């Protein structure tokens, strides 16, 4: 069966001519609550036409977060802080070695279609992984991007990237998280995104045997993002 999200036309997400989002990378770990407060304020400013769109790349200190569909029982071992958020999705983990990209775009200027926007984020991840010869795939019944793991047995798949979004006045925030080289044992304390089937686990690029760095992923991610959403403009963290 063909996944319906794969057939969506992504071209309109580039927006009108001259629409360029800022591209910011933070090198130091960013506290999750501080990042959320920044996104809330930035999204409001974008909606009011007082700030430009922004893609913010960062890493968090270890933290578990729950989206609007999260269940308390999905947190098995609260070894790190647990924060309830307003994003979509369930319980997940963020930590060092995971590239988080918070995407703050005005969909009124691009395409006011949430379903297509999520598919566009999935496509961005898939194209990023393709740069490292990793085949990422969508699944209709499971959010995020997955890779097949025949080395673990028939039907086994691992999640390599998560997606969780929120919109206010058609401005997006939150975004995606790609596992580059996080401590995968930290996922054992939760039911990642509510998936309990033992055939489905979590992996990372390094876990797949790829000697990639965060900088390598950042280059591929920006190229992939621009191929889906249009041009970006690199800025220094303090100018965002």
UniProtKB/Swiss-Prot annotation:
The BPL/LPL catalytic domain sits at 49-233
CDD domains the record matches: LipB
Residues with site note (Lowers pKa of active site Cys): 159
Quote the record's miscellaneous comment: In the reaction, the free carboxyl group of octanoic acid is attached via an amide linkage to the epsilon-amino group of a specific lysine residue of lipoyl domains of lipoate-dependent enzymes.
Q: Which PROSITE patterns does the protein's record reference?
A: BPL_LPL_CATALYTIC, LIPB
Q: Which domain of life does the protein's organism represent?
A: Bacteria
Q: Which gene encodes it?
A: lipB
Where mainly found?
Answer: cytoplasm
User: Keyword Transferase: yes or no?
Assistant: yes
Q: Which GO terms describe its cellular component?
A: cytoplasm
Q: Which organism is it from?
A: Bradyrhizobium sp. (strain ORS 278)
The active site lies at: 193
* PANTHER family according to UniProt: LIPOYLTRANSFERASE 2, MITOCHONDRIAL-RELATED, OCTANOYLTRANSFERASE
A Pfam family annotated for this chain is LplA-B_cat
According to its UniProt entry, the function of this protein is described as:
Catalyzes the transfer of endogenously produced octanoic acid from octanoyl-acyl-carrier-protein onto the lipoyl domains of lipoate-dependent enzymes. Lipoyl-ACP can also act as a substrate although octanoyl-ACP is likely to be the physiological substrate.
Q: Where does substrate bind?
A: 87-94, 162-164, 175-177
NCBIfam families associated with the record: lipB, PRK14341.1, PRK14345.1
Assigned protein family: Belongs to the LipB family.
Q: What is this protein called?
A: Octanoyltransferase
Q: Does the keyword Transferase feature in the UniProt annotation?
A: yes
Cite the annotated pathway: Protein modification; protein lipoylation via endogenous pathway; protein N(6)-(lipoyl)lysine from octanoyl-[acyl-carrier-protein]: step 1/2
**What keywords tag this UniProt record?**
Acyltransferase, Cytoplasm, Transferase
* Catalysed reaction equations from the record: octanoyl-[ACP] + L-lysyl-[protein] = N(6)-octanoyl-L-lysyl-[protein] + holo-[ACP] + H(+)
């Amino acid at each position: 069966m063909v996944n319906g999200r794969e057939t969506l036309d992504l071209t309109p997400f580039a927006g009108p001519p001259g629409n360029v989002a800022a591209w910011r990378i933070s090198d130091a770990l960013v506290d999750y609550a501080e990042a959320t407060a920044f996104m809330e304020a930035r999204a409001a400013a974008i909606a009011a036409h007082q700030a430009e769109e922004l893609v913010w790349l960062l890493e968090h200190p270890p933290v578990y977060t729950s989206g609007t569909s999260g269940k308390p029982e999905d947190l098995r071992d609260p070894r790190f802080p647990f924060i309830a958020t307003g994003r979509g999705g369930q319980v997940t983990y963020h930590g060092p070695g995971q590239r988080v990209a918070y995407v703050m775009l005005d969909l009124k200027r691009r395409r006011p279609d949430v379903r297509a926007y999520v598919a566009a984020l999935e496509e961005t991840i898939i194209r990023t992984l393709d740069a490292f010869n990793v085949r990422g795939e969508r699944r209709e019944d499971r959010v995020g991007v997955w890779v097949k793991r025949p080395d673990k047995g028939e039907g086994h798949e691992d999640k390599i990237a998560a997606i969780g979004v929120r919109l206010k006045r058609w401005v997006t925030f939150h975004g995606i998280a790609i596992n580059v080289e996080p401590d995968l044992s930290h996922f054992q304390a939760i039911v990642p995104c509510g998936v309990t089937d033992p055939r489905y686990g979590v992996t990372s690029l390094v876990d797949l045997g790829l000697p990639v760095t965060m900088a390598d992923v950042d280059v591929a991610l920006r190229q992939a993002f621009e191929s889906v959403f249009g041009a970006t403009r690199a800025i220094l963290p303090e100018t965002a």
